[in-house]
Design a protein with these regions (language model features):
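Short, mixed charged/polar active-site loops
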Residues: 85, 193-198, 231-233
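N-terminal core-binding DNA-recognition domain of tyrosine recombinases/integrases
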Residues: 2-9, 23-38, 47-129, 143-144
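Active-site/catalytic core of tyrosine-dependent DNA strand-transfer enzymes
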Residues: 202-255
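Basic, Lys/Arg- and aromatic-enriched nucleic-acid-binding interface segment
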Residues: 91-93, 106, 110, 116-166, ...
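Short linear capping/connector segments at secondary-structure termini
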Residues: 7, 117-124, 189, 222-230
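Conserved tyrosine-mediated DNA breakage-rejoining catalytic core shared by Y-recombinases
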Residues: 120, 162, 171-211
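Short basic/aromatic active-site micro-motif
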Residues: 42, 67, 254-271
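Short alpha-helical segment immediately N-terminal to, or the first helix within
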Residues: 79, 158-159, 172, 270-271
């Protein structure tokens, strides 16, 4: 069509086509180590939800040029009001829309960012939810894991006492532990802030490691592979959350507010 060719022809790519191009783009960024797994998984989820929402509209947009400020605003209202999500979730979606908008401009699908002018809800209005696990529940957790899953207990110890993030825990290897110095190294590749850190391990963590005989495994093995035991196969940190949700919450009758990450928020107590 000569009328389309005279304008920006990229603006007439379909919304679905451009979303697929963006999916391929962020997948390459993840494969090249630019995006962390958590970021990549989040963006893929946001993109999928955006497409599903558009498909559900009475008059969905067809071409990418139709993805304008009004559509972005309506989508954020859907996330925050219709789906009854938190302010933080709404802000996270706005961040995603900003990144997606930058992609659209940089790749000449649009001349301006469609989400420009949309504001985050101020952080001062957000009360960060932190759930502290009751000391008696911490004891029940410890007792249950001592009997049923001591390897998972080690992961709990690293999160609770050493304050290592779940993603970092999943990437730790046997060789990162210095038994003589009783330290563990969080390498720059693993660390969230991209800086290497050496952290002292409490004696009870060392004792549990010795009890589990993890030092009999090759140094290049991950501390938490399949079944939370040392092995050569990398397993995503999702396995920690899944076990907490599907097993511990059921067996110990923990409230939904208790999450694996709550161990990091909970003050140092006897576990």
């Amino acid at each position: 069509n000569p009328w389309i060719e005279s304008e920006n022809s990229r603006a007439y790519h379909t919304f679905g086509e451009v979303c697929e191009k963006y999916h391929q783009y962020i997948t390459k960024l993840f494969d090249d180590g630019i995006y962390r797994e958590e970021t990549y998984v989040g963006y893929v989820s946001y993109l999928r939800n955006l497409q599903a929402w558009n498909d559900s509209r009475r008059v969905p947009i067809t071409y990418i040029y139709q993805f304008d400020n009004f559509v972005c605003s309506e989508f954020l209202d859907h996330v925050y009001i219709d789906r009854k999500n938190s302010v933080q979730t709404r802000n996270n979606y706005l961040t995603f829309l900003g990144v997606f908008s930058s992609f659209l401009v940089q790749h000449q699908y649009m001349k301006t960012k469609p989400c420009e002018g949309l504001q985050r809800i101020g952080k001062s209005l957000i009360k960060k939810e932190r759930t502290i696990i009751d000391p008696s529940d911490m004891e029940r957790l410890r007792d249950y894991l001592l009997e049923h899953n001591k390897h998972y207990l080690l992961a709990c110890y690293l999160l609770h006492y050493v304050l290592i993030r779940p993603k970092e825990i999943s990437m730790l290897k046997i060789k990162d532990i210095n038994l003589c110095k009783q330290t563990i190294t969080i390498t720059a590749v693993v660390s969230k802030n991209k800086k290497t850190a050496v952290v002292t391990l409490p004696e009870k963590v060392i004792h549990l490691m010795l009890d589990l005989e993890i030092f009999k495994y090759p140094g290049d093995d991950y501390i938490f592979s399949r079944g939370f035991k040392p092995g050569s196969v990398f397993v995503e940190s999702k396995q920690f959350r899944d076990y907490w949700t599907r097993t511990l919450r059921k067996e110990l009758k923990f409230p939904n507010s208790y999450k694996f990450y709550s161990l990091k928020d909970t003050g140092i107590t006897e576990m």
